[in-house]
Amino acid sequence: MFELESNSLFERRLERFSRRHPELQRRLSRLFRDLEEDPFQPHLRLHGLSGHLEGVSAVWLTYQYRVTFTIDVGQNLIKLLNIGNHDEVYR
């Protein structure tokens, strides 16, 4: 079981995202639950990023929206970094 950790910047982005996309709340709750259980589940489409985001991973919320984070497998810790559309989170 993994622990999810966020900072104030992620919390603000999550709040803004939730206000703009209330229809995705159930899916977002499931995504966070699934990340806690096992971030390597195939349906999450976990993938590592490269370039200036090397060391960061992402999962799909929908085809358009992503959540980015870092994983510390040794400590079972996921640090949430960003949520938003593809272009926003990969800047």
Locate the predicted segments by residue.
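Basic, Lys/Arg-enriched alpha-helical interface segments
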Residues: 1-65, 72-79, 88-91
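Residues forming the ATP-binding cleft of Hanks-type serine/threonine protein kinase domains
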Residues: 84
